[in-house]
Amino acid sequence: MPYIVSLDFSSGVRVICELVDEPELEKLLENSSFEAKAERWGDEVYFELPVKLELKGERTLMEVGEVAYWPDGNCLCIFFGPTPMSRDEQPVAYSKVKPLGRVIEGLGRLKDVSNEELVRVSVKRR
């Protein structure tokens, strides 16, 4: 059963993501609601997780709308366009990430998220 992650940013932007049924994500259910400081890196929003996930990065070339775990920073990353590492419109992660799912609602609103904005994260099973 997949996970639904709701992201409510202090600017009023709301994004809903669906993550795969990855056993390691059970750790997020223990902290099913938390706040974090969102950061922007080009057209990527990322924020630190309250628990460390034991997942290894697999790739850097991403697709618009993909959600991934960044092991180096213990962050969840949402790609919605080119990043500083991109050569064209395809998002490229800073280092290898583990793809976990997709944005299913609000992808276009991510451009309105500011650097260091607070995000309220809610995680539940579908």
Predicted regions and their residues:
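Glycine-centered tight beta-turn/hairpin loop motif at sheet-sheet or coil-to-beta transitions
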Residues: 10-12, 73
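Short, contiguous acidic and Ser/Thr-rich linear segments
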Residues: 13-22
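Glycine-rich active-site loops that engage anionic ligands at enzyme catalytic sites
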Residues: 21-24, 32-126
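A short beta-strand micro-motif
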Residues: 3-10
